[in-house]
Curated annotation (Swiss-Prot):
Organism of origin: Acinetobacter baumannii (strain ATCC 17978 / DSM 105126 / CIP 53.77 / LMG 1025 / NCDC KC755 / 5377)
NCBIfam families named in the record: PRK02101.1-1 (NF002541), PRK02101.1-3 (NF002542)
Origin: domain of life: Bacteria
Gene Ontology CC terms: cytosol
The protein's name: UPF0246 protein A1S_2267
Lineage, top ranks: Bacteria, Pseudomonadati, Pseudomonadota, Gammaproteobacteria, Moraxellales
Family: Belongs to the UPF0246 family.
HAMAP family on file: UPF0246 (MF_00652)
GO biological process terms held by the UniProt record: response to hydroperoxide
């Protein structure tokens, strides 16, 4: 089983790291090409492209300028500890055991606009480049065209390395669009999380994002390898809804408190 999650806009480069083990990202030659494109943008152009404030745009212009592929702990940290958002609140990587991190390194991947596909212990310098950004580049008009099948091919390599034929999609639609489903050499399962509000069950963004992280943690801590095993997920009040699920989409509900 290989699980995919999205990255986060919010980053944490301050909290003390629980391990000094690390790996280097595997698609850095591609990242360097994107950095070259981004370095040509002014702060104002970044602000317009990313729909962010001048302050955030200036910060990221500086990050693009300072980026260099010689990553160490003076300028980078492991991806699983660097991202800080709703998904990562659910994942709570800082409290995973060593054996869990070892399992995650083989079975969890983070999609990234800049780095393509990250393993948990891959070092990364801070950045902001969302997958949906319409950044014109040497390969096309956006990041989906830039990455083309590169991410998909890497996923297939990672599936083969762990002898798995199951991909669990816990990523957002924006990021999952970077994966070419037709070329994935595995069964694909997507967990969906619905919360009850005013007597109706629906996807509530904040809760759904956190639930994806909780599911990733559930997979890691229990070292799951079969789609059937996912149905036992019952963290924080969620339960499997067999009636509304299919082989490709597993629905989990949580009743209003």
């Amino acid at each position: 089983m290989l699980a995919l999650i999205s990255p986060a806009k919010t980053l944490d480069y301050e909290t003390a790291l629980p391990t000094d083990e690390f790996t280097q990202p595997r698609l850095l030659e591609n990242s360097a090409q994107l950095i070259d494109v981004c370095r040509k943008l002014s702060a104002s152009e970044i602000a317009n492209l990313m729909s962010v404030s001048e302050k955030i745009a200036t910060l990221n212009a500086d990050r693009f300028r300072d980026w260099k592929p010689e990553f160490d702990f003076s300028n980078a940290r492991q991806a699983i500890y660097a991202f800080k958002g709703d998904v990562y609140t659910g994942l709570d990587a800082y409290h995973l055991k060593d054996k869990d991190i070892d399992f995650a390194q083989q079975h969890l991947r983070m999609l990234s606009g800049l780095y393509g596909l990250l393993r948990p212990l891959d070092l990364m310098m801070p950045y902001r480049l969302e997958m949906g950004t319409k950044l014109k580049n040497t390969r096309g008009h956006n990041l989906y065209e830039f990455w083309d099948d590169i991410i998909t091919n890497q996923i297939n390599e990672d599936l083969a390395a762990i002898k798995s034929e199951l991909l669990v999609n816990l990523a957002s639609d924006e990021y999952y669009k970077s994966v070419n489903e037709k070329k994935i050499k595995a069964e694909i399962v997507k967990p969906v999380f619905l919360d009850q509000k005013n007597s109706k069950y629906k996807v509530i963004s904040f809760y759904a994002k956190k639930a994806r992280g909780l599911m990733a943690r559930f997979i890691i801590e229990n070292q799951l390898n079969k789609a059937e095993d996912l149905k036992a997920f019952n963290t924080e009040g969620y339960y499997f809804d067999a009636d509304n699920s299919s082989a490709k989409e597993l629905v989990f509900k949580r009743d209003e408190q």
